[in-house]
Amino acid sequence: MPTINQLVRKPRQSKIKKSDSPALNKGFNSKKKKFTDLNSPQKRGVCTRVGTMTPRKPNSALRKYARVRLSNNIEINAYIPGIGHNLQEHSVVLVRGGRVRDLPGVRYHIVRGALDTSGVDGRRQGRSLYGTKKPKN
């Protein structure tokens, strides 16, 4: 417990909040070739590589991911949610924040049903997360 004198000399410092998705908080001025502070909920990007990755220790699977170059020229790894996808190199995707806990280095999700990404076929529940239209029946 500090004394009043200690607090007068050096007051308490508030914690600095670090962003969970730093690539979404930058814009790029291509004319000046400089980064600017520009917070966005999502960003557009182009897939440079689509592949699979194995998760961390207790889990076992082949998780689908894409390497994406965002509109601010930052390259990130983004998870492709849902069963099956139509992404390939040069596909244009929409990326949102949100990490995948068992994949190291994956801090972003691809939004299904937006731009070149199709929704998940045959999905009945939780459709909005997977970009699936309401079935006709």
UniProtKB/Swiss-Prot annotation:
GO terms for biological process: translation. It comes from the Bacteria. Coiled coil: none annotated. GO terms for cellular component: small ribosomal subunit. GO terms for molecular function: rRNA binding; structural constituent of ribosome; tRNA binding. Keywords: Methylation, Ribonucleoprotein, Ribosomal protein, RNA-binding, rRNA-binding, tRNA-binding. PANTHER family: 30S RIBOSOMAL PROTEIN S12 FAMILY MEMBER. With S4 and S5 plays an important role in translational accuracy. This is Small ribosomal subunit protein uS12. It comes from Staphylococcus aureus (strain COL).
